[in-house]
């Protein structure tokens, strides 16, 4: 796995210069993309295959540090733009139609956008947002064949097919005919195109007023928790074991804190803020000791030491009119789809105390097959695989303000069951601090703040427990598995359990929007995608994603997403997409080839053939790659050593003399506290890691220089690594980065020997062999690649993969 040189000083410089307007250049930003090498295993051929190949692609390409922001003065859209204008509607539609290959309906889709433009001009973007949002909801329910519930806020006229009238009849007719013939999957590309175009409402420039009522409104349910016996049974069914204590991990964030622009650098003021709510000092001690034992006591003593040292200077500063530090504040994030999310920014010391708990709960979620936190696709695939009833309905429920309204008392009981020392009450007390907001200081009345460590993780874990309790109430005695969860998103494939789930949620005071919930035997909505049986997988891109890809090389990220989901076939890639690209892209043939090779390898080799224990297109390159690789490695080592030294010098000269706090403490006070501040040790730790990484890289260079015969380099690992580079995300208008990328690819082409124009034949080769089992190929002459042995299922090596005798002719 690649590691990046740790350089916190660059962000330190950026924030310091932003506040004090200091002139001068930034410190050198070292971003060596290296691999940590275990020197004891360097002679092990199998162990070094992936290590050396990571080195080839990371060092030669060096693309991970590429920014996708456009700094030019062109009229093209910037990547960080979130809102659309009417002038961009037609281009958006044409791009979506091109990606989904629905050119026969392009005129119909242009009519939709024409009507949207008219509504914008006459009623404004706010009304258009509400209208398209309702059109989207009604369209999804109509495709799912659910009874339509008209909204009371906005009226949308329906046509004879019971689709919104804004959708032209030819599109409706095609979808309905396939639905009646029970082949709705045949309209997959058409539905994707339709929903993507309707999803343009998510990026309309709307004016949203933040709603704080979900935070301060009193509890409206019947009970704030569930019976302890049921909770213990549910947690036992989830195979969660009790924990005595956790290992404390010190962390620091470079994001904004409640008292400064960089949370890591304001730990002294964050410690001082505890005097505004003195009872939280003892609550912090209680939580730390219960979770971390003696190390928790040391953490509390560390915080108290800083508090007591800064207290005299703080009192003087407050008397002179300085701002009083705060424990936390509420920030508003204006998200897409007309949402204003209220995010809590809490104390850095509280975040440090919660960090290990945060990691532990996420570890528990990773072991639950029905959770989609780490893989959004997997839980629904397992649900379809394990589902026995072919006509079973999918209950996709939409929760309203789940984080704010899910009772924290229930989460406290779950924490007390998981941990032997019962830290739940002190955890709740630390989350219920007073948060500064435009409406004054607020405290969460029912739920917990979104944005604090452990917040989302506890929401997801509690959601799993609620489903298991609903299954127990339905008569299940074993673990219930016919569901999937992603945070507050849930799909249940059982009638009785779904009914009990609704009762539980009503008891707990959570509201479920029936109008937004998708309940159907055809498909449902999960993780912003429509999913169902028979590989029915409808995903719709937002405007921001489409325009983002339009600036990137060839839109191939979007195209390969369509490929991966079965919307189009691999053999259509060149005739339907690449050959129809504008002429401006012809100059990037080598980029095209590498993007195609990387993604097709990921699709074909990554999924189906590997499932059969076969590894295609795998050969070892010879020793001729070693000299150029050594030169590249040595150049990178020298560059990163210089960058690391420049960063250290900048830190010593300027890094610790600029205040980052907002409450008015004198700069010399912070300088006096440097030896005991967490930020000092975190920065030193990062520099030590950087030094260690570079030392290991130099050791690898030395061993490769004098023991090159111990290495075997597999081409498959190179191509696998290419799927993680930034080539598909490259902004083609950034000429410097395009030129640098092309130069690196030419170097890599000399090593890997994939000539320009060979990607089409590469696809044909993979597709031809990927359909055969066992695979038998006598000879493949194209592109100078020769197969020495037939591809069979005999002679398996390293975890069931066939080592093929490929080599460069």
Curated annotation (Swiss-Prot):
What's one Pfam family here?
Mitovir_RNA_pol
Specify the enzyme's EC class, one word: transferase
User: Any idea where this protein resides?
Assistant: Host mitochondrion
What is the E.C. number?
2.7.7.48
- Keyword RNA-binding part of the UniProt annotation: yes
Main subcellular localization, coarse class?
host cell
- What are the protein's UniProt keywords? Host mitochondrion, Nucleotidyltransferase, Ribonucleoprotein, RNA-binding, RNA-directed RNA polymerase, Transferase, Viral RNA replication
Q: Does Nucleotidyltransferase show up as a keyword for this record? A: yes
- Quote the function comment for this protein: RNA-directed RNA polymerase that replicates the viral (+) and (-) genome.
Quaternary arrangement and interactors, per the entry? Forms a ribonucleoprotein complex with the viral RNA. Since the viral RNA is not encapsidated, ribonucleoprotein complex formation appears to be the strategy to survive in the host as persistent virus.
The protein's name: RNA-directed RNA polymerase
